[in-house]
């Protein structure tokens, strides 16, 4: 087995738990200092994370160094941000909009890689709905997860059509609960997220409004303390992501199978997400393309009161990216499971 030479300080890292845990608002409540744990998330909206977890690459690569890998599931970008903020996570998956929001509000994170360029958000209506246009959303009840790309997709959609978030009633529900609310008639529309959205579509829900430009990239983020104290361990995570990117390109059907298994989807639905609505082969280095998207989203945060002022947005844009890890990504450092 390959052994990587590095000095681990890992002071301040959080304790592993016996089983995979879903991140909730209480994430990190029992977190204590541990010298030998890497806390990293997986999420159904981040297929590369599912590949890495499924293949066991981090465990194999880090075994000789005594580092235990603790996987925690992020139910949405807001939950990943909670995990990063509470230091229950060292590395977490969010949409770009959520990463900017967290940084602008003082969470000490850096974006160290891109994991996808997806079309993962849309405005979803139930089968047979009388909502035929965005204008028809005025006065309606819409499920959305605040602090995530679908929520900001909704805000941008309303603004583009001469409305504001105050013209609708937002039910702040986690993504899966939003689909449930749409399905049982509790809300009129849902700001959806794949892969749940693809499953809803298969069951008859309609993607009433789509706009690729309102989707931000998939951002992989890490806490500043982790990057400062454990840069080589952070590099290993990015190397594993590079290996997953290459593996996904060579094995798209197997990637869809992994997603289907974790998300509880039928394989045709998972295939739609992977093959039609996810670009996993995106350049992993954060840079100008992502910055331009966030520059458009940032002022919206101030307008709706999620960030206090534009100065905080500008400072976050200047300090959010650390491209050095993705620039040095090397999949050959990762040990495959035997």
Which residues does each PLM region occupy?
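Bacterial N-terminal signal peptides that target proteins for export
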Residues: 2-14
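C-terminal motif of bacterial Sec signal peptides marking the signal peptidase cleavage site
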Residues: 20-25
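Bacterial signal peptide processing site
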Residues: 27-29
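Short, glycine-/small- and polar/acidic-enriched structural segments
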Residues: 33-164, 171-172, 188-191, 207
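Small-molecule pocket liners
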Residues: 49, 117-123, 205-206, 216-220, ...
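Pocket-lining segment of extracytoplasmic ligand-binding domains
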Residues: 97, 170-171, 176-263
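Secondary-structure end/capping motifs
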Residues: 230-308
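Conserved C-terminal helix/tail region of periplasmic/extracytoplasmic solute-binding proteins
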Residues: 299-338
């Amino acid at each position: 087995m390959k052994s990587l030479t590095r000095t681990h300080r890992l002071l301040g890292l959080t304790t592993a738990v016996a089983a995979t845990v879903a991140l909730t608002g209480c994430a990190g409540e029992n977190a204590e200092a541990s010298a030998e744990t890497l806390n990293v998330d997986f999420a159904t909206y981040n297929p590369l994370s599912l590949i890495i977890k499924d293949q066991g690459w981090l465990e194999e690569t880090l075994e000789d160094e005594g580092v235990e890998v603790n996987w925690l599931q992020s139910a949405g970008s807001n939950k990943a941000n909670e995990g990063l903020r509470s230091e229950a996570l060292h590395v977490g998956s969010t949409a770009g909009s959520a990463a900017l929001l967290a940084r602008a509000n003082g969470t000490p994170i850096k974006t160290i890689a891109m994991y996808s360029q997806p079309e993962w958000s849309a405005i979803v209506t139930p089968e047979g709905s009388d909502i035929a246009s965005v204008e028809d959303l005025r006065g309606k009840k819409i499920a959305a997860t605040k602090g995530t790309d679908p929520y900001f997709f909704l805000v941008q959609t309303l603004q583009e059509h001469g409305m504001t978030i105050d013209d609708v009633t937002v039910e702040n529900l986690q993504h899966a609960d939003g689909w449930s609310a749409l399905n049982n008639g509790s809300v009129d529309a849902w700001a959806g997220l794949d892969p749940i959205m693809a499953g809803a579509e298969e069951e008859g829900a309609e993607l009433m409004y789509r706009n690729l430009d309102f989707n931000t990239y998939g951002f992989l983020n890490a806490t500043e303390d982790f990057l400062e104290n454990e840069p080589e361990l952070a590099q290993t995570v990015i190397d594993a992501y590079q290996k997953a990117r290459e593996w996904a390109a060579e094995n798209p059907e197997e990637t869809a199978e992994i997603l289907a298994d974790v998300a509880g989807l039928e394989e045709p639905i998972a295939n739609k997400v992977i093959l039609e609505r996810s670009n996993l082969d995106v350049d992993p280095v954060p840079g100008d393309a992502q910055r331009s998207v966030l520059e458009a989203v940032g002022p919206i945060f101030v307008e709706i009161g999620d960030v206090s002022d534009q100065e905080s947005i500008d400072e976050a844009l200047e300090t959010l990216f650390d491209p050095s890890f993705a620039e040095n990504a090397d999949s050959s450092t990762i040990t495959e499971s035997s």
